[in-house]
Amino acid sequence: MAAADGDDSLYPIAVLIDELRNEDVQLRLNSIKKLSTIALALGVERTRSELLPFLTDTIYDEDEVLLALAEQLGTFTTLVGGPEYVHCLLPPLESLATVEETVVRDKAVESLRAISHEHSPSDLEAHFVPLVKRLAGGDWFTSRTSACGLFSVCYPRVSSAVKAELRQYFRNLCSDDTPMVRRAAASKLGEFAKVLELDNVKSEIIPMFSNLASDEQDSVRLLAVEACVNIAQLLPQEDLEALVMPTLRQAAEDKSWRVRYMVADKFTELQKAVGPEITKTDLVPAFQNLMKDCEAEVRAAASHKVKEFCENLSADCRENVIMSQILPCIKELVSDANQHVKSALASVIMGLSPILGKDNTIEHLLPLFLAQLKDECPEVRLNIISNLDCVNEVIGIRQLSQSLLPAIVELAEDAKWRVRLAIIEYMPLLAGQLGVEFFDEKLNSLCMAWLVDHVYAIREAATSNLKKLVEKFGKEWAHATIIPKVLAMSGDPNYLHRMTTLFCINVLSEVCGQDITTKHMLPTVLRMAGDPVANVRFNVAKSLQKIGPILDNSTLQSEVKPILEKLTQDQDVDVKYFAQEALTVLSLA
C-alpha cells in the first residue's frame, strides 16, 4: 500500500500509512487522526479498495486508536464516493462495534447511526439491516449490546416484512440471557417505541416493557422506568391506565431503592406524560410515598421535584392537593435527619410561594422557611437565603422583614463564630435581593458591628463583605453610608478596632477609586501614623503601600512620602521595616 518511491507528492501519505503500522501507539494514533488526509490523497476508489480493507483487518489495537478510528469513520461518506458507496464503511465499524471496550463500541454505534441516514432504503435493506441482524445474533454479548442502538435508525425506512423481522430481533434482545444486553435493550426501548406504529407499540413494546420492568436485575428495571416516559407519551389517554400504570405503580414501590430513585428522578416527566387525571389519582399518592421513603437518596430526589410537581398539577385542584397532601410531607422533610434531603428541599421550597399565594405563604410556608434558616446545615440556610426574592415578590418586603429578618439577625449575633461567619458570607446576596433602602434601614448596623467582633476571622470577613456591598450599591453609597462609620473607628480606644479602620480602607480604596480615597480616606491613614501603638503604626505603612498605586504622583510626593520617611525613623523595628518597604515598592525611596 505504500506509495511509489518516485512520487514525492505522495511521500507524506506513505509516511502516514507506514505510521498506521508503527509499533509506537502515539504515531498510530496521530496517523488515524489524519485518516481523512490519507483518504483524500488516495482518492475514493483506493480508499474503498485498499484503505478500508486494511483498516478492517487491523482492528486489534489500543483502545485509544480504535476510539479515534470509530469517530473518524462516521464522517467518511464523501471520502468513499458519497451515499451510494456509504455501505463500504460498514465492515470496519461492525468490527469496532464488537470490541470489548465500551467507549469504542459506543463510538462505533454513534458513527453507524450517523451514516445510516445516508443509506438509501434499498441499501439499508441490503447492507445495514443484515449488519444489525449479525450484531443482534452475535455470540458475544458485546455485539448484541451494540445492536440495541441501531434499530430505531433503520426501522422507519424499510419494508413492513423487514420491520417485522427487526421487531422480532429486538424482542429477543429484551429477553437475552445476559443482563448487560437486557440493560442495553431497556435503555433503547423508549427510542425504538417512538418510531413504531401505534398498534405495534401496544401489542409488542408494552409486553417487552412489562418484562423489563419486572426483570430480576434492578439495573434493568430502573432503565425501564426511563423508557416509561417515552412510551406514556405515545399512548392515548384511555390506554395508559391499562398498559402503563400497573408497571409504574410497581416501580414506585420496587424493593430496590435505585428503581424508586429513578421513579422520583423522572417524576415530573412522568407526570406530564400521563396527564392531570392519572396524576391526581395515582401520582400524588406515589409522590407522598417517595417523600416518605426509607432511603434518603429517594427522599432527596423527590424533594428536588416538589416545586415542579406542584406547578404541573391542574389548576382546579392544585391548591387543595398541595395543602392537604403535599404540604404535610414537606413539613416532615424540613426536619429530616439527612442534610442532603433538607438541602434539596430548601433549594426549591421557596418556589411554592407564587403557587400558593400570599395568605398561604404567610401562614404555612414562612414557619418552614424560618426553621430552615435556623438549620445547622449551612447548605440549607444558603439555599433559603439565595431564593428569598421569589417570596419577596409574593408577600412583600415588609412582611418578609417582620418574619425572616429577626432570624437572620439572630444568626448574625450567634454565639458560635462560624455561624456568624456564614451569615456574613450571605450578606451581599441578601443585600442584592432586598435592595439598598431596606439594607440601610435593617442590615447596615449589623455589618458595622461585625467589624468590631472579638474574633479576627469575623472582622476579616466583614471587611471583604464591605467591598462586595460597595460593588453592589456603588461608591456614592459607600461615601454616604459606610466610609463615615469606618473612619469614626479610627478614634476607638481599642487598638484592634483602629486597625480594622486601616484594613477597611485597604479594600474600600480598590472599589471607591482615586477621588474618594484621596479626599476622604487618606487623611485618616496619615493621621494614624502618630498612633501610640506600634502595631497600628506599621499597619499605616502597609496601608499606604496598598493604596499608593491608586493615588496620583503629586499626592504621593507631598503627603505620603514625608509620613513614610518619618516612620523609617521610628523606634520600633517593625514600623521601620514596613515603612522602608513601602517607600521602595512605591518608588519613593
Curated annotation (Swiss-Prot):
The PR65 subunit of protein phosphatase 2A serves as a scaffolding molecule to coordinate the assembly of the catalytic subunit and a variable regulatory B subunit. Upon interaction with GNA12 promotes dephosphorylation of microtubule associated protein TAU/MAPT. Required for proper chromosome segregation and for centromeric localization of SGO1 in mitosis. Together with RACK1 adapter, mediates dephosphorylation of AKT1 at 'Ser-473', preventing AKT1 activation and AKT-mTOR signaling pathway. Dephosphorylation of AKT1 is essential for regulatory T-cells (Treg) homeostasis and stability. This is Serine/threonine-protein phosphatase 2A 65 kDa regulatory subunit A alpha isoform. InterPro entries: ARM-like (IPR011989), ARM-type_fold (IPR016024), HEAT (IPR000357), HEAT_type_2 (IPR021133), PP2A/SF3B1-like_HEAT (IPR054573), PP2A_Regulatory_Subunit_A (IPR051023). Residues 8-399 are annotated as: PP2A subunit B binding. Changing V470A: In HJS2; uncertain significance; does not affect interaction with PPP2R5D and PPP2CA. GO terms for cellular component: chromatin; chromosome, centromeric region; cytoplasm; cytosol; dendrite; extracellular exosome; FAR/SIN/STRIPAK complex; glutamatergic synapse. GO terms for biological process: chromosome segregation; female meiotic nuclear division; intracellular signal transduction; meiotic sister chromatid cohesion, centromeric; meiotic spindle elongation; mitotic sister chromatid separation; negative regulation of hippo signaling; negative regulation of phosphatidylinositol 3-kinase/protein kinase B signal transduction. The lineage of its organism: Eukaryota, Metazoa, Chordata, Craniata, Vertebrata. Residues 400-589 are annotated as: PP2A subunit C binding. Residues 85-239 are annotated as: SV40 small T antigen binding. Belongs to the phosphatase 2A regulatory subunit A family. The keyword Membrane applies. It comes from Homo sapiens. The keyword ATP-binding does not apply.
